[in-house]
Amino acid sequence: MKIFIDTANVEEIRKASKLGVLAGVTTNPSLIAKEGRDIKEVIEEICSIVDGSISAEVMALECDEMVREGRELAKIHKNIVIKIPMCEEGLKAVKVLASEGIRTNVTLIFSPLQALLAARAGASFVSPFLGRLDDIGNPGIEIVTQIAEMFALHGIDTEIISASVRNPMHVLDSAMAGSHIATIPYNVILQMVKHPLTDAGMKKFIEDYNKAFNK
């Protein structure tokens, strides 16, 4: 499973990139708004840091405007993937953009049937939201499992991006369920690095070495 970072914060992306694990970045209007910068400026800078898929989301709610915005965003860099919300107008836009060779990531997926429709419309990626489903009492990982099984059964090439990831367990569960990608906040990536036994082991190695050589 590939690791993406879910943020528009350039410093977080830069730090995570240095770990050598990033295959891409996902952004959304809320994340861009937090940065207080022009979306094109932010996306251009992100593309200069990470050589992988960079999802940039349209703001429009009607097909024609989604397509127009998508075309403009796609011009920024060859790695741009256009993020489209799951809705009737969104599916229409995905079909048009896909016919032009522009990759799309259909977001706000909360059911396997939504994922199926997005895939058949031509989406390159679908993004089921784990955390938000957990919030309403539905185990988010179940949708990832169902989508992965359905896509495998029918030979669908659309990749699954586990989104709304809240903790390391979401990442582990996604990997075991067959998700192709997990897009992860920076703080969760840092949590994945840590384990108390690793820290204790490092401390013990240093203590033993220093004791042996009177350091």
Curated annotation (Swiss-Prot):
Positions annotated as active site in the UniProt record: K83
Organism in which the protein naturally occurs: Clostridium perfringens (strain ATCC 13124 / DSM 756 / JCM 1290 / NCIMB 6125 / NCTC 8237 / Type A)
This protein's pathway: Carbohydrate degradation; pentose phosphate pathway; D-glyceraldehyde 3-phosphate and beta-D-fructose 6-phosphate from D-ribose 5-phosphate and D-xylulose 5-phosphate (non-oxidative stage): step 2/3
Domain of life: Bacteria
Main location per the UniProt record: cytoplasm
GO biological process, one term: pentose-phosphate shunt
Cellular compartment(s): Cytoplasm
Keyword Transferase tagged: yes
Record-level Gene Ontology MF annotations: aldehyde-lyase activity; transaldolase activity
Gene Ontology CC: one annotated term: cytoplasm
CDD domains referenced in this protein's UniProt entry, alphabetically: Transaldolase_FSA
Gene name tied to this protein: tal
E.C. numbers: 2.2.1.2
Catalytic activity, as annotated: D-sedoheptulose 7-phosphate + D-glyceraldehyde 3-phosphate = D-erythrose 4-phosphate + beta-D-fructose 6-phosphate
Family the entry assigns: Belongs to the transaldolase family. Type 3B subfamily.
NCBIfam families linked: fsa_talC_mipB (TIGR00875)
Pfam families: TAL_FSA (PF00923)
Keywords: Cytoplasm, Pentose shunt, Schiff base, Transferase
Name by which UniProt lists this protein: Probable transaldolase
